[in-house]
């Protein structure tokens, strides 16, 4: 049993909200409560939180920007840590260092402001820098692995260390920290000098493509499935006749079948059921088993 008075005393000054519904913070607008939702303002507060949780044997996790995640309806036990206030972006020559809570889109606009090229591919990717590094986010032929130099991480024990891009062992939507449990707290990117107008035009072009193809008008978890070798997930889903298929308030997007949108106050179970149905149907129709890109976390509603 957690001693709440001890928690409040030892973590005084840190913004902690009790039994806080996570659907207020997720891109899907679903998710049950976090026992303790924390918003550290700096690395010092973050380390205090993690060391307290470890000492008191309270589970903890970082939710980041919650853009490619489904939080189950039963919520998450222990501490959920948000990096909303860790969002500093700094430029030094041709490198950008961004804290994990900085929005990836904001980081690309800082690059544009300084006429730095190489980050245009990320101009429409929602979510945070930390989450983007964690999953090696990418679009339009670019990915985080192409520009990352190194990142600072918080280990499960509460220590801070630096990991090089090579040590990250990036793969398609994967990195070594998905296995180690290390949490990105900042990342350094190497870019190249470019022409402001050319960079701006490319970002406008990619943003227009995204607006044309993606269902941005509804809450969603972003791209649901990884791209199967030699195929497109959205095309396989469309060919299986699943465009517009709905379970509860969640629907396979009629605009892009690779997305699932919350059109009518859906819940996390609707998402899980629809994902399972799509995987089963596509495999039956095409022989190809889709693999989830979106992470599903938390507990089912009892």
Swiss-Prot record:
This is UDP-N-acetylenolpyruvoylglucosamine reductase. It is found in: Cytoplasm. Residues 29-194 form the FAD-binding PCMH-type domain. GO terms for biological process: cell division; cell wall organization; peptidoglycan biosynthetic process; regulation of cell shape. PANTHER family: UDP-N-ACETYLENOLPYRUVOYLGLUCOSAMINE REDUCTASE (PTHR21071:SF4). Its cofactor is FAD. It catalyses: UDP-N-acetyl-alpha-D-muramate + NADP(+) = UDP-N-acetyl-3-O-(1-carboxyvinyl)-alpha-D-glucosamine + NADPH + H(+). InterPro entries: FAD-bd_PCMH, FAD-bd_PCMH-like_sf, FAD-bd_PCMH_sub1, FAD-bd_PCMH_sub2, MurB, MurB_C, MurB_C_sf, Oxid_FAD_bind_N. The keyword Hydrolase does not apply. It comes from Streptococcus gordonii (strain Challis / ATCC 35105 / BCRC 15272 / CH1 / DL1 / V288). Pathway: Cell wall biogenesis; peptidoglycan biosynthesis. The keyword NADP applies. Pfam families: FAD_binding_4 (PF01565), MurB_C (PF02873). The gene is murB. Its EC number is 1.3.1.98. The active site is at 173, 223 (proton donor), 293. GO terms for cellular component: cytosol. Keywords: Cell cycle, Cell division, Cell shape, Cell wall biogenesis/degradation, Cytoplasm, FAD, Flavoprotein, NADP, Oxidoreductase, Peptidoglycan synthesis. Cell wall formation. It is an enzyme of class 1 (oxidoreductase). One of its GO terms (molecular function) is FAD binding. Belongs to the MurB family.
């Amino acid at each position: 049993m957690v001693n709440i008075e001890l928690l409040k005393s030892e973590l005084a000054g840190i913004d902690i909200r009790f039994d806080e519904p996570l659907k207020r913070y997720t891109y899907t607008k679903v998710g049950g409560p976090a026992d303790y939702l924390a918003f550290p303002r700096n690395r010092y507060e973050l380390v205090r939180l993690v060391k307290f949780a470890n000492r008191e044997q309270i589970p903890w996790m970082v939710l980041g920007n919650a853009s490619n995640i489904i939080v189950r309806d039963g919520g998450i036990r222990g501490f959920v840590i948000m990096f909303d206030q860790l969002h500093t972006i700094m430029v030094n020559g041709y490198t950008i260092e961004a804290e994990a809570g900085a929005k990836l889109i904001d980081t690309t606009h800082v690059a544009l402001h300084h006429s730095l090229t190489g980050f245009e591919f990320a101009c429409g990717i929602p979510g945070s820098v930390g989450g983007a590094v964690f999953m090696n986010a990418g679009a339009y032929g670019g990915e985080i692995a192409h520009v990352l130099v190194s990142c600072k991480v918080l280990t499960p024990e509460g220590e801070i260390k630096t990991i090089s891009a090579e040590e990250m062992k990036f793969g398609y939507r994967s990195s070594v920290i998905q296995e180690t449990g290390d949490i990105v707290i900042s990342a350094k990117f190497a870019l190249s000098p470019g022409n402001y107008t050319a960079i701006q035009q490319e970002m406008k072009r990619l943003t227009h493509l995204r607006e044309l193809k993606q269902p941005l008008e509804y809450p969603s978890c972003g791209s649901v499935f990884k791209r199967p070798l030699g195929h497109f997930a959205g095309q396989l889903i469309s060919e299986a006749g699943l465009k517009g298929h709905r379970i509860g308030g969640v629907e396979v997007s009629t605009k892009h079948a690779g997305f699932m949108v919350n059109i009518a106050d859906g819940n996390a179970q609707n998402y899980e059921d629809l994902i399972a149905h799509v995987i089963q149907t596509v495999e039956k129709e095409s022989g190809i088993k889709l693999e989830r890109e979106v992470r599903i976390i938390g507990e089912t509603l009892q």
